[in-house]
């Protein structure tokens, strides 16, 4: 067996953890089997008054015994849900147009809107901590790690922010909407933009890799023949999925 193909090989999760591939396969197989035979329950969550454009889910939250779902919609609101009961815990208002992207951790929630702003919230209390302005068109993607936040916009630009100070710098190069962003660090313990990299996916059919320390594009990945909607990194591969139904690795 070669490296990466043996029983000990692992699969990298979104949080950087490594799980044995057999355990991941068994889990996915059980989910597929339960779905096929109707062994599942359905809960419909109602509250938004217009289309829902983004969501994020966390199963384990410190000091909480239930999973949390947060959704954003064209009704300009963000809703925090208790998935165990289906109850709306909080409704966050403040955006002037639809909410297109969001991400949250144990306490902090960041939302991006077509009103061209980012908002940083304490989702547990509902407090609005900061509003970030800089993009000239709506914000359609974001990603953050600790104090580093990157946002992508319909203005074709990326901005990298310090969540604490509100300072930012732009990354220019894409020629159309920036649909997806993914931070990547060479060191799992690094919280500084000095050692962080960023993948971006765009409607211009390309994916770009950026060096945040030098604020420059290191590489342009070309291959999709349509807009690229998603990008995801793992420990040994970078994968993107586009509207051309293609996949590049």
Give the residues covered by each predicted segment:
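Intrinsically disordered, low-complexity acidic/Ser/Thr/Pro-rich linker and tail segments
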Residues: 1-61, 66-79, 87
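Short coil turn/linker residues within repeat-based beta-strand modules
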Residues: 39, 85-87, 96, 125-127, ...
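WD40/WD-repeat beta-propeller blade N-cap
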Residues: 45-52, 93-99, 106, 125, ...
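Loop/turn segments within WD40 beta-propeller blades
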Residues: 56-66, 102-107, 125, 142-147, ...
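A detector of tandem-repeat and repeat-rich interaction/domain scaffolds
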Residues: 67-71, 78-80, 88-90, 101, ...
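Conserved strand-to-loop turn within each blade of WD40 beta-propeller repeats
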Residues: 72-75, 111-115, 123, 136, ...
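Hydrophobic, ordered structural segments
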Residues: 98, 103-111, 116-119, 124-129, ...
């Amino acid at each position: 067996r070669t490296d990466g193909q043996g029983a000990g090989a692992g699969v990298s999760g979104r949080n950087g953890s490594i799980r044995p591939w057999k355990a991941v396969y068994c889990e996915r197989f059980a989910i597929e089997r339960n779905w096929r035979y109707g062994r599942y329950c359905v809960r419909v969550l109602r509250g938004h008054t217009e289309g829902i454009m983004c969501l994020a889910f966390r199963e384990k939250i410190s000091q909480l015994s239930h999973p949390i779902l947060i959704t954003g919609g064209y009704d300009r609101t963000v809703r925090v849900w208790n998935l165990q009961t289906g109850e709306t815990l909080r409704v966050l208002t403040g955006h002037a147009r639809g909410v297109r992207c969001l991400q949250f951790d144990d306490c902090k929630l960041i939302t991006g809107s077509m009103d061209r702003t980012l908002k940083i919230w304490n989702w547990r209390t509902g407090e609005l901590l900061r509003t970030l302005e800089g993009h000239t068109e709506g914000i359609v993607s974001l990603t953050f790690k600790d104090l580093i936040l990157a946002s992508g916009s319909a203005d074709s630009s990326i901005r990298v922010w310090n969540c604490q100070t509100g300072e930012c710098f732009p990354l220019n190069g894409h020629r159309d909407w920036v649909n997806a962003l993914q931070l990547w660090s060479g060191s799992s313990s690094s919280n500084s933009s000095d050692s962080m990299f960023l993948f971006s996916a765009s409607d211009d059919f390309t994916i770009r890799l950026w060096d945040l320390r030098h604020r420059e594009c290191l590489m342009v990945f070309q291959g999709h023949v349509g807009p690229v909607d998603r990008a995801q990194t793992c420990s040994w591969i970078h994968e993107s999925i586009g509207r051309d139904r293609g996949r590049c690795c």
